[in-house]
Regions:
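Aromatic-residue-lined binding/catalytic grooves and analogous aromatic/hydrophobic interfacial grooves
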Residues: 175
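Single conserved hydrophobic/aromatic residue that forms the stacking wall/gate
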Residues: 253-261
Length: 261
């Protein structure tokens, strides 16, 4: 992101919880002038107040972006208060899980530029992956700027259709929970084999961290990386056989989509 881009844009952040704070921290680190950021939060933290951004103050008349980082259930109550920014040039960027673009258009107006994004929890440390999709009212330039704003919390990808968001939610949105469960399972297994709990957990965490970094940085596909570390008739193969021993080949392949819950 260029300094010029920061200087010519004003932004309102609705909600400054974990994800909102992560984005704000990223924007400020990358050079966004705190004077050009307004934050609406009912319980501002000491950290937020100390950033120098405009907290719960009079809002700008023509913001470039309004980032929606409040809980989905709060949207019907909160968002109508910002409907006067709708049907114009202001772009609404939502990271509220499960809320479709059509729902925002119903609250803000059919001509409102809206971008729906789905980050995941590693965004809290700048290592997230966010998928975004826009309606037809968003210009190419605005979509690119939104991508740069979202890049403050990690990688950004664009979708071809909002229908893909369900798959994104099941994969990268829920994926960290599956990985955390795997870490716990590895640590428990290690403890049951005689390791103390602290050592087992450290081994599990670093194994997943290292494997993830290797998969992300290597030109070798994960399937081949798995094969490379799996000796015939060895302990790794035996463990994989247990993990894959079900009718569908692997339980992860049958994880529920948001449509199933």
């Amino acid at each position: 992101m260029t300094q010029e881009m920061f200087d010519r844009n004003t932004l309102i952040l609705l909600g400054c919880g974990k994800m909102g704070s992560a984005m704000l921290k990223g924007w400020l680190t990358k050079g966004f002038d705190p004077k050009n950021i307004w934050v609406e939060d009912p319980h501002p933290s000491d950290w937020l107040i100390g950033t120098g951004v405009n907290v719960n103050l009079n809002l700008p008349p023509e913001p470039t972006f309004i980032c929606i980082a409040i809980k989905p259930q709060m949207i019907p109550q909160i968002l109508p208060k910002f409907s006067h920014y709708g049907n114009g040039l202001c772009v609404f960027l939502s990271i509220a899980a499960g809320v479709k673009i059509s729902s925002f258009q119903a609250l803000l107006g059919q001509k409102t530029p809206i971008i729906r994004a789905m980050p995941n929890t590693p965004a809290e440390i700048g290592l997230g992956i966010t998928a975004q999709i826009a309606n037809e009212n968003v210009s190419k330039d605005a979509f690119e700027v939104a991508g740069k704003l979202l890049s403050a919390i990690g990688e950004v990808v664009s979708l071809n259709s909002e229908d893909q968001m369900d798959a994104v939610t099941g994969l990268s949105g829920s994926g960290p929970a599956y990985v955390f469960y795997l870490i716990d399972a590895l640590a428990v297994a290690g403890h049951e084999q005689g390791l103390d709990k602290e050592l087992a957990m450290k081994l599990a965490k670093m194994t997943v961290l290292g494997a993830g970094k290797l998969a992300a940085s290597s030109s070798v596909v994960p399937t081949d990386l798995r094969v490379n570390v799996t000796s015939p008739n060895g302990t790794t193969e035996a463990g994989l056989n247990i993990l894959m021993d079900n009718e569908n080949g692997c339980l992860l392949y049958t994880s529920p989509s948001p449509r199933d819950v």
